[in-house]
Amino acid sequence: MIVRKEVKRLHKFFAFKQKDESETELNIYGDIVSMKWFENDVTHFDFAEELSKVTTPNLTVRINSYGGEVSQGLGIYNLLKEWNGHVTTVCDGFACSAASVVFVAGKTRVMPKTSLLMIHNAWTIASGDSEDFKKMAEDLEKINEPIVQS
């Protein structure tokens, strides 16, 4: 007879944790996406829902992420910029692509010497005719504007 034990999940990659009465900490240790495929993925919707529960005046956002979808990263950026408390962002490893946008939302930003911030122009994979590609190039230029402004 095989007995299966339920395994408790010990670590949540995207989790808000109140450290004390004055500070809440959040880890973004996965991809920033519009639809979750893996446990450690972060969506703008989930982030907004969790951020609305924070009652402390300070929030520390710890990031180790290759990034993801720019729309989701910009959404999280805007939530952090509009939040009433003090936001500190810490790059624990990588803050790449959409995660770099989230990183710059912090009023205080911490980059240890062994961490890496990677920012790039928007890119995509496309198919179509020459008109489709012209339109895609225009769209990518428009997408770059808010990234640069952040």
Task: Please state what every model-predicted region is.
Residues 1-150:
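Terminal-region recognition feature
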